[in-house]
Amino acid sequence: MERVLLNKVRYLVEQLHWDVTVVTTDQHGREPFYPFPEGVGMIDLDVNYSDDNGKPFLKKLLGFLRRRRLHEKRLKALLNEIKPDIVDCFYPGECSFVPGLKDGSRKVMELHQSKLFHHQYNRSGLMGLADKVRAKMDEKLVRKFDRFVVLTEEDAQMWGEIPGLKVIPNAAKFIAERFSDGSAKRVIAVGRLDYQKGFDRLIEAWRIVQQNKAYADWHLDIFGQGEWKEMLQKMIDERGLQNCVRLNEPTKSIGKEYAESSMLVMSSNYEGFPMVMIEAMACGLPAVSFDFKCGPKDIIRHGVNGLLVKNGNIQGLADAMMTLMGDEALRKQMSLEARLVTETYSEEKVMGKWVSLFTAHR
């Protein structure tokens, strides 16, 4: 998400010379992981929702309500001070109260998840009911914005007739300095170590792969951090995969890691738009992915630049990986096709859509 924001801000500031202010809530004095261009206003409201993580449910709920009131108060004061033309907010954050702030700006909401993401956990009981209620509340919320932006045509169809609904994908700002030649016996996966990314499913699929001695010299590298790290490492150890599966910390040199791999695998339960897939394919990696909602159908041409697998089919994911692992010529052919994804998602095309949206009816 931070890279997506950075790319958009950089274009608006460096190419169009717009005044841009980035407002955050939980920086705790930390610098952004990726440096923003000089001249960008960086303001942290010091709300710090994350300070309540790990607390008992009731304390966490009361803390959230208190911090939300503080968030609204401080953001309202800031907007009345700087008087922006446009307020572009990322769900969830401040989206619940931004439409009600009367500062004279046009309000834009970006959703970087699919419409179904509240339902992805398939929870039952009170938590399942809460998920359904939140989904219904979202349907009412998005109608309050001047523009509502989703990332894929598939997601837009699920939202239906929403006033101001626009589809703008993320741009392939990533510039590949090196390209994969498809010869390395290495598979890569990138993302947070949590439920959404589904790396537990990938590890199970890799266990199946490793039962075939023909692929005993292949390795899987997962790059990311998150609350599932300990659990995933335990899975790796219990399945005897510690010599062929590694959990790696995030790196700012991910392009180098892509270039030294032969395919990307995505095992997510859901996404808004898989930016990792775009970046890896820009480096020449064919993508093997579950057909989760949303994104893979928009990006992967099955059998051309990657392989799609029915979501949740662990055996199918293993088979798809082995199809590419066992055919270097096919990997190299798909690698060339994968690199063409940058044409569809070029920064010029995508940012042209954003500029049109921001400048309409000014």
Question: Where are the regions that the model predicts?
Answer:
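N-terminal strand-loop element at the rim of the active site
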Residues: 11, 16-62
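Aromatic "clamp/platform" in nucleotide-sugar-dependent glycosyltransferases that forms part
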Residues: 250, 269
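A conserved mid-protein helix/loop that constitutes part of the nucleotide-sugar donor-binding site
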Residues: 2-7, 185, 189-210, 227-233
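Short His-centered aromatic/hydrophobic patch
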Residues: 89-94, 111
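Carbohydrate-associated surface elements
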Residues: 154, 171
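Conserved acidic donor-binding segment of nucleotide-sugar-dependent glycosyltransferases
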Residues: 301-303, 307-314, 322-328, 343
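Short hydrophobic beta-strand element within catalytic cores of glycosyltransferases
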Residues: 286-290
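Membrane-proximal helix-turn-helix segments that form the acceptor-binding/catalytic region
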Residues: 73-77, 128-148
